[in-house]
Amino acid sequence: MSSSKTYCIFSANYLPNVGGVEKYTQNLAFALADGGDRAIIVTSNVFDLPAWETLRNGVEIVRLPCWKILGGRLPISRRNAEYRALYSRLAGKRIDYVVVNTRFYRHSFEGVRLAEMKGIRPIVIDHGSAHLTLGSKILDVAVAQYEHAVTRSLKRHDADYYAVSGASCRWLEHFGIVSRGVLNNSIDAEAFRRSSSGRDFRSELGLGDDRFVVSFAGRFIPEKGIVPLMDAAEQLSGESDVVFLLAGDGPLKREVEGRGLPNVVMLGRLDAPDIVALLQSSDAFCLPSRSEGFSTSLLECAACGLPPIVTHVGGVDELMLDESYGCLLSEATAEEIVKWVRVLEDDPERCRAIGEKLRGYVEEEFSWPRTASKVREACAAANSSRTSD
């Protein structure tokens, strides 16, 4: 008799939307499938893709119809005829465990509802370390109130809570939730490097080896720290040897473009293979985020042996054991960023040593098979405790 299990993973957003939760969901599902289990991803159909899709590795993707609130950042299911048909088909599947990624989306309740229908105690994995921000004090207050309201409602349901980092565990305490442990973000470092498109961004942009290249990859939104990063670039604009390469898109794109800084190159939204090539063409990676659960970008830069310049957000405690693993910003300010850029630029040997040490640590400690095993244990424990209550 087969011991394989079926894991149903709920994530409000999924690829091609770019984000850490989306990548976490994909990699977890693939790792479970590679280990002999079945995985079904249930998400929102933000991009009008096929409603039900089976990938070559057997992973199924179910895309529920949705209202695309905030440009798709906050999708809410449309419970129309298509939704009812999809959910009925999903409910008819043999499902052993339910995993819900993040607690503050209405989509999370879709997972909890299915779990209750199946008599399953779900696990909820938190990916944050601070409230969401839209860059407006008034809107941010409303978003925080919304997050608290959704979380209070979710807490009424039976579930075990986990987080992707120690910082996320501590953030759950803000909502009166005690995390049962860490199910950390991970990366297949070797496969990530192999996936590179091979583009030579230095050559394409006419940047010689004497130029110190600092890269950024992520959404152009306030919480990613794009504004202080541009302030730092402006302070360094008179120094011709430092150049910032920015990959991504978002609401603050026009503000960044409007600066017209000579040492900033906007590359637009890059495909994953080009992101790898960008990191491999860089000297350092900067992510002055306000909030991260466990930054996927930080793992990716580590996989490429690139020294990070990063704020003390989720994942930093796990990855950067001390200053020999990276450069920790005391706060997300231009002055702090400039300080660390200059430190690395002036000491190439230190720059290289940090990257090599971080890369070795990530390869040894942060693999997806290991995280998938932890998820299996968490799901089994959740349902074992339920039957013994």
Regions found by a protein language model. Name each.
Residues 254-273:
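Nucleotide-activated donor-binding/catalytic signature segment of Leloir-type glycosyltransferases, i.e.
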Residues 307-310:
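Short hydrophobic beta-strand element within catalytic cores of glycosyltransferases
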Residues 113, 117, 130, 142-161, ...:
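Membrane-proximal helix-turn-helix segments that form the acceptor-binding/catalytic region
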Residues 290:
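Aromatic "clamp/platform" in nucleotide-sugar-dependent glycosyltransferases that forms part
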Residues 167, 186:
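Carbohydrate-associated surface elements
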Residues 322-323, 327-334, 343-348:
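Conserved acidic donor-binding segment of nucleotide-sugar-dependent glycosyltransferases
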